[in-house]
From Swiss-Prot:
SUPFAM superfamilies to which the protein is assigned, alphabetical: Protein kinase-like (PK-like)
One of the GO biological process terms: cell differentiation
Protein name stated in the entry: Shaggy-related protein kinase GSK4
Annotated source species: Oryza sativa subsp. japonica (Rice)
Keyword Metal-binding part of the UniProt annotation: no
Reaction catalysed by this enzyme: L-seryl-[protein] + ATP = O-phospho-L-seryl-[protein] + ADP + H(+); L-threonyl-[protein] + ATP = O-phospho-L-threonyl-[protein] + ADP + H(+)
């Protein structure tokens, strides 16, 4: 890892660790096979290209009249092994939407669709509707029609990096707080683990600064005692238990990923830029030090007898520049814990003092406009300790809420 700005050069610390970790035969296993998939109406149409029009029928349930709506594909905004996401315009209403088009296995239900149908939160991307389309090769595609948000946190970060600037702290607070609100909702209400939190999967409205967690293609409802694949989550943001091959993990893997995103916003570059699964663990050990036997047991009991070279943790204040607020460093340290059960929850992160500025009575955006909604909590506060609720809801917000 390169030296952090204002911090130590850690490059020499990892040689012995790399040799030891390599002996663990930690590797990137292949991607999981297709999951259960299924969906609604089948419509004709070729692959989306600029100017191509896709038509579908919506309605027809609960005495709602059926109607045809058409979308004109305007530009591709994302591609991957899953398929393609393109920006489109509804010809009937003029509304801009994002359509995610994924190849559909006719034998299965689509897990992403099932999860998206179960969610409704201001910090989670919303599904408007969905439809199937076919190609001339008789391939079946599922089209998820979602609200369109023009920017991603990745692009916002890149903008500041290109300008050789750090993201202003007020935006770090605003974006991370909303990420944790979104995670608090998905972890508790539908009870889902996202499993791929990274800047590319966080959308930002540049006018309102509202943030939305997107891309539920890897998401899953985790069931205690049921095995899951460990090769999940993009490398820089992968929790150490996943690198250790754990298959019974919890939603705390998302908390680790969010901690990596927070550190990246503060530093202007990834905290753990590993070049492979092995190197990823090396990068983590160079910062957090060698995990204790108990920490290894919490991540994956199969590795407790494995002998790691003893590397001391690098103090967090040496990773970040001297002017970094102690509250920011404290929050990072509570998120990036080896033991999954020691990481704070998403709601506890929201209540952290790092975000106190957002709770001030007359707090506003730097341009004088109001913040996006921050305190309109609903189901995610069910069964939450009253003390935590009072920390999450400032007095001025309590007057307008049901809590």
């Amino acid at each position: 890892m390169a030296a952090m700005p204002g911090g130590p050069d850690l490059a020499g610390a990892g040689g012995a660790v790399a040799v030891a970790v390599d002996a663990m035969q930690v590797d990137d296993p292949p991607r999981a096979s297709a999951e259960e998939k299924h969906g609604p109406t089948i419509m004709g149409g070729n692959d989306p290209v600029t100017g191509h029009i896709i038509s579908t029928t919506i309605g027809g349930k609960n005495d709602e009249p059926k109607r045809t709506i058409s979308y004109m594909a305007e530009r591709v905004v994302g591609t991957g092994s899953f398929g393609v996401v393109f920006q489109a315009k509804c010809l009937e209403t003029g509304e801009t939407v994002a359509i995610k088009k994924v190849l559909q296995d006719k034998r299965y239900k689509n897990r992403e669709l099932q999860i998206m149908r179960s969610m409704d939160h201001c910090n989670v991307i919303s599904l408007k509707h969905c439809f199937f389309s076919t190609t001339s090769r008789d391939e079946l595609f599922l089209n998820l029609v979602m609200e369109f948000v023009p920017e991603s946190l990745y692009r916002v970060l890149k903008h500041y990096k290109d300008m050789k600037q750090r993201m202003p702290l007020i935006y770090v607070k605003l974006y991370m707080y909303q990420i944790f609100r979104g995670l608090a909702y998905i972890h508790t209400v539908p009870g889902v683990c996202h499993r791929d939190i990274k800047p590319q999967n966080i959308l930002v409205d540049p006018l309102t600064h509202q943030v939305k967690v997107c891309d539920f293609g890897s998401a899953k409802m985790l069931i205690k005692g049921e095995a899951n694949i460990s090769y999940i989550c993009s490398r820089y943001y992968r929790a150490p238990e996943l690198i250790f091959g754990a298959t019974e993990y919890t939603t705390s893997i998302d908390i680790w990923s969010a901690g990596c995103v927070l550190a990246e916003l503060l530093l202007g570059q990834p905290l753990f830029p590993g070049e492979s699964a092995v190197d990823q663990l090396v990068e983590i050990i160079k910062v957090l030090g060698t995990p204790t036997r108990e920490e290894i047991r919490c991540m994956n009991p199969n590795y407790t007898e494995f002998k790691f070279p003893q590397i001391k943790a690098c103090p967090w204040h040496k990773i970040f520049h001297k002017r970094m607020p102690p509250e920011a460093i404290d929050l990072v340290s509570r998120l990036l814990q080896y033991s999954p059960n020691l990481r704070c929850t998403a709601l506890e992160a929201c209540a952290h003092s790092f975000f106190d500025e957002l709770r001030e009575p007359h707090a506003k955006l730097p341009n004088g406009r109001p913040f996006p909604p921050l305190f309109n909590f609903k189901q995610e506060l069910a069964n939450t300790h009253p003390e935590l609720v009072s920390r999450l809801l400032p007095e001025h917000a309590q007057r307008h809420s049901g809590f």
